[in-house]
Amino acid sequence: MAEITAALVKELRDRTGAGMMDCKKALAENNGDIEASIDWLRTKGLAAAAKKAGRVAAEGLVGFATDGTRGALVEVNSETDFVGKNEQFQAFVRDVTQVALAEGITDIDALAAAPYPTGGTVAEQLTSNIATIGENQSLRRVALLTVNSGAVTGYVHNAAAPGMGKIGVLVALESSAGADVLEPLGKQLAMHVAAANPLALNGDDLDADLVARERAIAEEKAAQSGKPAEIVAKMVDGAIAKFRKENALLSQLFVMDGKTPVAEVVAAAGKDVGAAITLKGFVRFQLGEGIEKEESDFAAEVAAAAGV
């Protein structure tokens, strides 16, 4: 059996909000496997559903740039939050995002190899910045959204500077209406995405493995009710339908009023402007999402430096 360390218990508590003894028991029952322990706690009703696994721990900035019918989103990581406030780092994020937009880049390796505005490549400028700022930095990911007609709108939450912050969102609206008409709706929808964190545009687009995991948890919880099999099946189907509804953008309740599905908000906006509007897609980057940052033992570092 794997050793159940205090660090494992702490991580499980941080990710689930469950009590210490419950976390210890979950880890013991699942041989120290964090993900299996989360599912075990949820089947016992001791932990809330986690939309995405993994601690969010990396620093840096997410930047966006749009030009009407196109938008680019880029994440650049650093070791500390302090670098995210550095003007040179912010200028790099701004330039790299513009490069991604101008060149239509969707691949991080292609972005690294792209020409940088002041000369050389993006990767070479990044290397120069690392030497100047004195802290490791990396290009993490890039995304591009386009529409044939309409608008792609961007939004950042917790902005450190114009167009860059901790959470970045792009929303694509297809319509014959002008970009200036669509901009207010796009901004509100992007703010909704930042807050509600949908996992897909439609319920049917949700990741199959994620839905299967939710179904397994729902089946275990429903089985514990002791109800007849046909009732248990309906309970499971209801739980999955609720999961799809709450995690798909078009069926989520609009955060601005808390009662209207996003699909209805878009349809109503189309009637208001006299042109059909289709929400074609969205991209949401949360800084450090899915990256586990190694925690250092400061006392041990000092001791090592002193040769103790």
Swiss-Prot record:
It comes from Sphingopyxis alaskensis (strain DSM 13593 / LMG 18877 / RB2256) (Sphingomonas alaskensis). One of its GO terms (molecular function) is translation elongation factor activity. InterPro entries: EF-Ts_dimer_sf (IPR036402), Transl_elong_EFTs/EF1B (IPR001816), Transl_elong_EFTs/EF1B_dimer (IPR014039), Transl_elong_Ts_CS (IPR018101), UBA-like_sf (IPR009060). This is Elongation factor Ts. It is found in: Cytoplasm. PROSITE patterns: EF_TS_1. The keyword Cell membrane does not apply. The gene is tsf. Residues 80-83 are annotated as: Involved in Mg(2+) ion dislocation from EF-Tu. Pfam families: EF_TS. GO terms for cellular component: cytoplasm.
